[in-house]
């Protein structure tokens, strides 16, 4: 709260900001504080499918294949023997070991997988495999939490401040060119005061 109050105080007491910017500060705070949050929330829900009907109902799991049947006990055994090994590393090791097995060694697990698939078809005759889409990672500059009103306000005011300064600079140069265009030409007969005045305007 202290940072937000100090930011507001500095904005209202500064002479660099135009009256239009100061009048629009409450609107900026209301419209910008949750702008990124709302867009990210809607994008996150669309990408992960949180509101889809498929997630409300329990999804039917796929029947296990031969590799899954074989790896159930092997994964449990490897995890107990290597408690610090990551799950991804265990999967790599199991995949390598499965490839090293002969067809005769794999055959019992293929038979078990066929039995499980037959039981699955009887239990779920209308089952169709629908792979899930992986949820995309949210941008780093976007948060699901409400944005800090002070930071959003300061960023908006800084942008308007830059535009305001550019307008003031253009107006100043325009006035200087207009005044220089009305100055009398400098010649040898001009007085020292006229030459000093012309030199002063050209140096601005």
UniProtKB/Swiss-Prot annotation:
Region feature (Necessary for interaction with ZNF208 isoform KRAB-O): 138-155
Assigned protein family: Belongs to the SRY family.
Post-translational modification: Phosphorylated on serine residues by PKA. Phosphorylation by PKA enhances its DNA-binding activity and stimulates transcription repression.
Result, substituting residue 18 to N: In SRXY1; partial; also in two patients with a Turner syndrome phenotype
InterPro entries: HMG_box_dom, HMG_box_dom_sf, SRY, SRY-related_HMG-box_TF-like
Subcellular location(s) of the protein: Nucleus speckle; Cytoplasm; Nucleus
GO CC term, one of those recorded: nuclear speck
Region described as Sufficient for interaction with EP300: spans on this chain: 107-139
Disease: 46,XY sex reversal 1: A condition characterized by male-to-female sex reversal in the presence of a normal 46,XY karyotype. Patients manifest rapid and early degeneration of their gonads, which are present in the adult as 'streak gonads', consisting mainly of fibrous tissue and variable amounts of ovarian stroma. As a result these patients do not develop secondary sexual characteristics at puberty. The external genitalia in these subjects are completely female, and Muellerian structures are normal.
Name of the molecule in the record: Sex-determining region Y protein
GO BP annotations listed: cell differentiation; male sex determination; positive regulation of DNA-templated transcription; positive regulation of gene expression; positive regulation of male gonad development; positive regulation of transcription by RNA polymerase II; sex differentiation
Cross-referenced SMART domains: HMG (SM00398)
Calcium listed as a keyword: no
Main location: nucleus
Effect upon mutating residue 64 to I: In SRXY1; alters interaction with DNA and DNA bending; abolishes nuclear localization
Free-text domain note: DNA binding and bending properties of the HMG domains of human and mouse SRY differ form each other. Human SRY shows more extensive minor groove contacts with DNA and a lower specificity of sequence recognition than mouse SRY.
Location of the region described as Required for nuclear localization in the Swiss-Prot/TrEMBL record: 61-77, 130-136
Mutation effect (residue 76 to P): Reduces nuclear localization. Reduces DNA-binding. Does not reduce interaction with KPNB1 and CAML. Does not affectnuclear import
């Amino acid at each position: 709260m202290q940072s937000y109050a100090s930011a507001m105080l500095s904005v209202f007491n500064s002479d660099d900001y135009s009256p239009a910017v100061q009048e629009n500060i409450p609107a900026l705070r209301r419209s910008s504080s949750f702008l990124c949050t709302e867009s990210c929330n809607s994008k996150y829900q669309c990408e992960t499918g949180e509101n889809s009907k498929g997630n409300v109902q329990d999804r039917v799991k796929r029947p296990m294949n031969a590799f899954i049947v074989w790896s159930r006990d092997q994964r449990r055994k490897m995890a107990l023997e290597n408690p610090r090994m990551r799950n991804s590393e265990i999967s790599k090791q199991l995949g390598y070991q499965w490839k090293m097995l002969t067809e005769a060694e794999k055959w019992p697990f293929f038979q078990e997988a066929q039995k499980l698939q037959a039981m699955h078809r009887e239990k779920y005759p209308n089952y169709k495999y629908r792979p899930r889409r992986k949820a995309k990672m949210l941008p780093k500059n976007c948060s699901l939490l409400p944005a800090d009103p002070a930071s959003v306000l300061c960023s908006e005011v800084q942008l308007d401040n830059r535009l305001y300064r550019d307008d003031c600079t253009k107006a100043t140069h325009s006035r200087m060119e207009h005044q220089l265009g009305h100055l009398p030409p400098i010649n040898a007969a001009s007085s020292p005061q006229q030459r000093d005045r012309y030199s002063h305007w050209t140096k601005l």
